[in-house]
């Protein structure tokens, strides 16, 4: 059994005389683009303040003036006009955190003794650990859990291999496999740097569906070697979740593993995104009163996520889709040796449109962006059909400013938690694997993906459904179980 390690809340537990530094990659991916205070950049400061109550108020004022958001303030000690206080506040990025510290140190009678970044504190020693399901407290326990008693269980599996699902962790365990080549918005950062993300993924599996997942970060980019390694470790796992492997290698790796293994293989960057997009679109089209088979859909980005989104939408009945990359529409005259792009060309863009993304938006009903930030303006969205649906999913900066899009679009969704209608893969993968493991499934089909999307969409009732609530929140406990149930019924 795997267990999420409890977080370390306050500086009282762990002190640093200087803050743990954020990497330049993290700043580039998040810090310089996030302008509002965020829990991603929560800091806790221990401060000496001279001058009594008014001085403490001045400290609070200074933090507010520098646009940080105070979460908590606790008096640690107070004696002879000197207070020691712990202040926890959200900042916008690493530079903003340092500005807050510098501003406090510049005040008369104020000294920042120590400060820490709570995100880094949460990660000290990792976020997950192994825990025992059965205690081993004496020789009797030991003789059953290990030698000699375990030999009987080994031979039972040897004689009846199907019993591995009943008698080992395989029945509830998933490998989260990456080579670290396409990590979030950070790109090719390697397997070691990818590990915190994979730990986080494993924690989400456990938190939302009680699935025991474990990171497997591979120090190779060779397609054949990755396939070989995953096949070799597969006997331990009931499923394989491929994560953050760059395109186009991810397509071949998934396809080959699905063909050669007898357990489900799921590339979340492709299909997890596609499931949640379809779920959100099902409900968004209800809001605007349109049918999937009738609407014209523009998809910006035809990599792993875009490819899977297009395939799943077609499987659900969409008939009018055009895919776009940085060079414009994918059309019959633009075929290459990339089989996945060519498949999109052969199955979409029936009118063979050859223009740019901005041109393709004119008169479109739906925009789905899985590409790059700030490539469109509110004026571009205004050229879409009435009752437009806009899913701007690039992170951390959407393809178009959500507020600008909302001036003319009927429904707007992003991949971010600070806007309504967050399209987040965590709505899909925990429940999906819960259902697959429960059913001891060996494959994942398009019908299963569609069923998962329908299950997510169904959590939002007709009474709740509106333009700012088309998709349930990630902490809605109904989501995972409903998805799991849909998968069990499909298997």
Residues covered by each model-derived region:
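A conserved regulatory-domain signal marking ACT and ACT-like small-molecule sensing domains
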Residues: 12, 22, 27-124
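Short hydrophobic alpha-helical segments enriched in small aliphatic residues
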Residues: 14-16
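Short, structured coil segments at secondary-structure junctions
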Residues: 108, 209, 260-261, 317, ...
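Glycine/serine-rich phosphate-binding loop and adjoining beta1-alpha1 elements at the start
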Residues: 112-295
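Glycine-rich phosphate/diphosphate-binding loop of Rossmann-like nucleotide-binding domains
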Residues: 184, 191-209, 261, 267, ...
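Adenosine-phosphate binding glycine-rich loop
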Residues: 264, 268-269, 288, 392-491
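Rossmann-like adenosine-cofactor binding region
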Residues: 342-411, 416-420
